[in-house]
Amino acid sequence: MPPSASSVGFSDLLNPQNPTESAPSTPVNKSPASSAPSSAQSNSTMASSVSLLPPLMKGTRPANEEPRQDLPRPYKCPLCDRAFHRLEHQTRHIRTHTGEKPHACQFPGCTKRFSRSDELTRHSRIHNNPNSRRNNKAQHLAAAAAAAANQDNVLVNNTGSMMPPPSKPITRSAPVSQVGSPDISPPHSFTNYAGHMRSNLGPYARNNERASSGMDINLLATAASQVERDEHFGFHNGPRGLPLFSSRLHNSSRLPSLSAYAISQNMTRSHSHDEEDVYSHRVKRSRPNSPNSTAPSSPTFSHDSLSPTPDHTPLATPAHSPRLRPLGTSELQLPSIRHLSLHHTPALAPMEPQPEGPNYYSPTQPHHGPSISDIMSKPDGTQRKLPVPQVPKVAVQDMLNPTGFVSVSSSTSNSVAGGDLAERF
């Protein structure tokens, strides 16, 4: 049985020397009638070989490249088992392990990088093609980036003319108030310009952020002190039979409250907004953890409606605190430390709230004893001493009895309230 045409074509393609060897085997002395079928057979063999050529080229290497398999592969990858004939092939392969992309696109506005040069060449065709949509988008992005860079340069060059110097020095200790004063630029113009400032104008922006954080802390402290005052007020308005010194001991044993922090923050802020600090400069705070303290942690004067405590809160002044006059007087001068007495001042008697009448003193009452101005006007330095207050002798039963002893009536005398209470306002 003769072999088929497809098998003959496949063997001839794999072994090119077979046709020369099989040529003598074909009969030469054939009749012309048999030559026509042989020519048709040869044509079909050529067609089948051509049809089989593409899959052979895809699946196997050409015959002229077979000797390349025997070439040495001296360049081996240190990270895997692959070896290469050329050094550049090994270098290109190692970049697949390291992720290095040394080939960057040189087109303005494009930030892409590639590990192989042929990938960069293929990518550059996108920018060179004028009909590509990606090219148009890249051009728009590049133009926008160039315009932004030019605008930044203009802003940096014109910062001296656009930003006026601040009219008041900015301190780190005083928080910035939200109330606008007439000598400060409007806040909206500063915030609009602050978004475009660069690193050389950074301290102003940081001061703004620090001020906002300080204001947040002040708001929290104010809210906490308000709650604390409400609780303190509810405690004092509770049962009338409770003696006041028990609450005084309870208040003096705790740590400094948040209300003292809020008042201290109000005292340290700038005086350009005095409408907020109408009463803060009049408030007298005594230290709650003082060993000689016999007063509550935060006694305040109830002289007007802006006082943080109600009008019927009892007024108590520790015995060791100085007798202060109002800040508006010009003759206020405190004695030096060497002129003060080192003797221990006896504690004041406890006082109870008066149920009726908001006023605890009468400005028209006669003044007993020398005042601070009289003491300070003495020429002799040894005579400049505060008089020792005369504490009334009260029994323990009178102190515990709410109706037996009321010390509010004597709070304006020299022994309890210092005698100069009317001069404080």
Swiss-Prot record:
Residues 1-29 have a biased composition (Polar residues). One of its GO terms (cellular component) is nucleus. InterPro entries: creA/MIG_C2H2-ZnF (IPR051007), Znf_C2H2_sf (IPR036236), Znf_C2H2_type (IPR013087). Residues 63-73, 271-280 have a biased composition (Basic and acidic residues). It comes from Aspergillus clavatus (strain ATCC 1007 / CBS 513.65 / DSM 816 / NCTC 3887 / NRRL 1 / QM 1276 / 107). Keywords: DNA-binding, Metal-binding, Nucleus, Repeat, Repressor, Transcription, Transcription regulation, Ubl conjugation, Zinc, Zinc-finger. GO terms for biological process: carbon catabolite repression of transcription from RNA polymerase II promoter by glucose. A zinc finger (C2H2-type) spans 75-97, 103-127. GO terms for molecular function: RNA polymerase II cis-regulatory region sequence-specific DNA binding; zinc ion binding. The gene is creA. Its main location: nucleus. PROSITE patterns: ZINC_FINGER_C2H2_1 (PS00028), ZINC_FINGER_C2H2_2 (PS50157). Ubiquitinated. Deubiquitinated by creB, probably to control its activity or amount. This is Probable DNA-binding protein creA. Transcription regulator component of the regulatory network controlling carbon source utilization through ubiquitination and deubiquitination involving creA, creB, creC, creD and acrB. Represses the transcription of the alcR, alcA and aldA genes by binding to a GC-rich region in their promoter. Also plays a role in response to carbon starvation and the control of extracellular proteases activity. Interacts with creB. Residues 31-51, 288-302, 406-416 have a biased composition (Low complexity). Belongs to the creA/MIG C2H2-type zinc-finger protein family. PANTHER family: REGULATORY PROTEIN MIG1-RELATED.
